[in-house]
Amino acid sequence: MKKYLVISGIDGSGKTSVINALKEELERQGHSTQYIWMRFNHYSVKVMNALARVLKLSVPVHNDFGDVWEHRLYKSPLFCKIYVWCSYIDNRIARRKALKLDADFIICDRWVNDTLIDLGAECRIPVILGSKWYNRFKKILPKNTEQYVIVRGRKDIVDCRVEN
């Protein structure tokens, strides 16, 4: 039976290194593996992002990495509610990509937890991982899914990634 392994963690936590080592070890043991990046599955959210720009809920800012759009979605609770629903729908659609893969282990680079953390930050939803949204999003995950969060010391993260 196919098993899904979701690897989560902040930028610089070592997800890629863990995923590569995990894939190598599972294949060494004779298991087939496939990798899929499951973050930013935007379909309807693309429309919401465009609308956010028109409504000035996303604004252009200049930082060390150049010109980027900064979300300030929290300024409109109604917009946030619709945005979270759209993200939920998009993740349900994206689930099909993972289900189509055929291997003993499907390694998912980020997914539900990472999406929820982003939504919590953009919409200022406190404790989103303990909310009704977590329960809804969690049901998107296929059966036989295990989630792992990579934890790394703050100094190590800051030292390895300039943007942190």
Where are these regions (language model features)?
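Walker A (P-loop) ATP-phosphate-binding motif of ABC ATPase nucleotide-binding domains
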Residues: 4
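Hydrophobic anchor at the beta1->P-loop junction of P-loop NTPases
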Residues: 7
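ATP-binding Walker
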Residues: 12-13
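Walker A/P-loop
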Residues: 16
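Post-Walker A helix-loop "phosphate-sensing" segment adjacent to the P-loop in P-loop NTPases
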Residues: 24-35
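ATP-dependent small-molecule kinase phosphotransfer cores
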Residues: 40-128
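Conserved phosphate-donor/acceptor-positioning beta-strand/loop module used by diverse small-molecule
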Residues: 104, 108-114, 130-131, 138-161
